[in-house]
């Protein structure tokens, strides 16, 4: 149940300005730069006090109360612009013709100032609201009081005080997802700070699935910037799995051509060659490589490209079923050429996100048919490449894999189950993916790993500690719940880069690793060929994943602390372990190492 508190801040105005200040009672001990969590789409997700997140989520909303409403949120706006300058984070975004410019600035110890400018055409009959959402988990018993320019929310372990720059009238509503406030405010936040020990328990008696290690995507798009990022990542991370692009439309652009003959006669497209060389480099490092296709040639598209329009990044090409044999031969020719001329045998093949259509679209049954038919075609050529079941755009579209999952005739051609982690990774959904892989006795892969598919549009967010924390939280949860064979970062190139500087997304200074890089380096430092170890935490704010290679006596326990600073007490460590190395990554430390005797 969600309670909403709304304050009308704008109606038919050309320009409107209002201010917000967050006061934290002088008990803040974290660096100010880590105090306020601001998402790239403008939402504030709370303020940290001694590491404890005093949670509330702000949003901007435009529309009709109890009616049609547009709300700021992840991937809900068209290219919001995020920027940080010192202690100030700003976002510019537009909702229904109203342009909002929000600045969030840490002003002093425990003091955060928020200012919002709104620009609107006076002909628009729209009402805009500034909302604060309060979760049922921490505010189910909350008491809300308003008086003039002040609103207070008090629960058993939270207290929020909002001070406005003018008198306001609050409207309270009950909804199903949280609690929200629309304001021109100055909030004062405090709460119970939990420094108690986190008790971490390993279950060494029930080891789970193999974790090959962390992987990466290497779809080449930027010849100027990709090489330096790829080199840095491959030289400084243990990368255990790779995924590259099959540039199909460049491999055989003409229907009646012989692509192998063209290539052998010196006509191989440069981008095709670069993709093959990328795969060869990864194979030379000893890792399996997945081949995925985004863009089909025009001749293979049902109705031709002109009959399709790209909307929101999705074009959803249907392949021409009348040309199925030519399509299968064209793709198989690439696999044969890669083997004969580059020594590459691809482990698995997929059409990228064919549940959604980026860019080839399949129905669930077509996906099952493709796995069975193309899998048999490759087997007939003695090629070892298997199919990925799924390679879905999100965890949410699980049902897409059901026809193939329920058809035993497809199983011998499936090398792994795969989904992308952009959306929908709640515990229940993640468990469904893990169970699907177990049902047909194949590994689970996260074919594209990260949290926000639209983040390239506001790339400065990649350098934010909050983004880094959300990402590593997700990976740790996936490792614990799904026990995947690998998570393949999107990407280990300049696209969604783990590095900053030297012109990456226009950034200045030398090329350097971000906090995201160090988070992922810690996870990638898991011992090779380790098994997932079931692990539990006594604190819900501490996410854990554990791995062990019992043969070599090597173990790793990964802990992500979303709460206040606390001690971790680990039980279940094998008796033969006498010393632990502890690595810490945060806004200040980059895999800082200390040794702890057991």
Where would I find each of the regions flagged by the language model?
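Acidic-aromatic substrate-binding/catalytic surfaces of carbohydrate-active enzymes
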Residues: 35-94, 101, 220
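Beta-strand-rich recognition/accessory modules
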Residues: 61, 65-72, 83-87, 92-96, ...
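Acidic (Asp/Glu-rich), glycine- and aromatic
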Residues: 111-146
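Carbohydrate-binding surface patches
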Residues: 112, 537-578
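C-terminal beta-sandwich/jelly-roll accessory domains of carbohydrate-active enzymes
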Residues: 134, 145-175, 559-598
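Substrate-binding cleft and catalytic face of glycoside hydrolase catalytic domains
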Residues: 202-206, 237-406
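Noncatalytic carbohydrate-binding groove/subsite architecture in carbohydrate-active enzymes
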Residues: 324, 361-474
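Aromatic/acidic polysaccharide-binding cleft in carbohydrate-active enzymes
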Residues: 443-522, 527, 531-542
């Amino acid at each position: 149940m969600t309670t909403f508190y709304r304050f009308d801040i704008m109606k038919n105005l050309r320009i409107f300005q209002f201010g917000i200040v967050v006061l934290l009672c002088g008990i803040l001990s974290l660096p100010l730069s880590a105090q306020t969590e601001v998402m790239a789409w403008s939402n504030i997700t709370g303020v940290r006090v001694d590491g404890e997140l005093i949670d509330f989520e702000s949003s901007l909303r435009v529309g009709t109360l109890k009616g049609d409403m547009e709300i700021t949120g992840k991937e809900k706006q068209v290219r919001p612009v995020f920027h940080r300058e010192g202690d100030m984070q700003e976002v510019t975004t537009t909702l229904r013709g109203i342009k909002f410019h929000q600045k969030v600035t840490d002003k002093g110890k425990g003091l955060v100032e928020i200012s919002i400018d709104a620009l609107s055409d006076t002909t628009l009959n729209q009402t805009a609201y500034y909302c604060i959402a309060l979760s049922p988990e921490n505010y189910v018993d909350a008491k809300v009081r308003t008086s003039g320019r002040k609103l207070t929310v008090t629960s058993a372990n939270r207290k929020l005080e909002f001070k406005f720059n003018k008198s306001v009238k609050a409207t309270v509503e009950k909804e199903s997802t949280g609690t929200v406030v629309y304001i021109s405010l100055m909030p004062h936040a405090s709460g119970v700070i939990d420094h108690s020990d986190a008790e971490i328990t390993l279950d060494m008696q029930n080891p789970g699935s193999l974790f090959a290690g962390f992987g990466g995507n290497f779809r080449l798009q930027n010849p100027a910037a990709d090489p330096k990022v790829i080199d840095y990542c491959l030289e400084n991370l243990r990368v255990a799995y790779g995924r590259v692009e099959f540039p199909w439309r460049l491999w055989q652009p003409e229907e009646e051509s012989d692509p192998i003959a063209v290539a052998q006669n010196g006509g191989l497209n440069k981008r095709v060659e670069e993709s093959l060389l990328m795969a060869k480099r990864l194979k030379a490092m000893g890792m399996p490589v997945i081949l995925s296709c985004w863009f089909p040639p025009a001749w293979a598209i049902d109705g031709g490209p002109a009959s399709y329009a790209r909307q929101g990044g999705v074009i959803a090409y249907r392949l021409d079923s009348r040309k199925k044999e030519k399509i299968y031969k064209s793709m198989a020719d690439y696999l044969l050429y890669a083997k004969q001329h580059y020594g590459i045998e691809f482990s698995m093949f997929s059409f990228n996100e064919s549940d959604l259509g980026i860019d080839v679209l399949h129905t669930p049954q077509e996906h099952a048919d493709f796995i069975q038919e193309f899998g048999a075609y490759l087997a007939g050529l003695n090629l070892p490449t298997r199919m990925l079941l799924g390679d879905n755009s999100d965890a949410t579209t699980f049902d897409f894999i059901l026809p193939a999952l329920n058809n035993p005739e497809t199983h011998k051609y499936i090398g792994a189950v795969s989904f992308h982690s952009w959306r929908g990774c709640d515990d229940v959904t993640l468990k469904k993916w893990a169970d699907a892989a177990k049902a047909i006795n194949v590994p689970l892969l996260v074919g594209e790993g990260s949290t926000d598919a639209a983040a390239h549009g506001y790339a400065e967010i990649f350098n934010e500690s909050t983004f880094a924390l959300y990402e590593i939280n997700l990976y740790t949860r996936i490792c614990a719940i799904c026990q995947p064979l690998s998570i393949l970062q999107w990407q280990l190139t300049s696209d969604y880069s783990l590095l900053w500087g030297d012109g990456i997304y226009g950034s200045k200074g030398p090329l350097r690793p971000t906090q995201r890089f160090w988070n992922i380096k810690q996870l990638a430092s898991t011992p090779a060929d380790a098994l997932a170890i079931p692990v539990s935490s006594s604190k819900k704010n501490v996410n854990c994943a554990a791995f062990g290679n019992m043969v070599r006596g090597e173990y790793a326990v990964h802990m992500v602390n979303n709460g206040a600073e606390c001690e971790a007490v680990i039980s279940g460590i094998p008796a033969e372990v006498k010393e632990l190395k502890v690595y810490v990554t945060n806004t200040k430390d980059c895999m800082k190492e200390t040794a702890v005797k057991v």
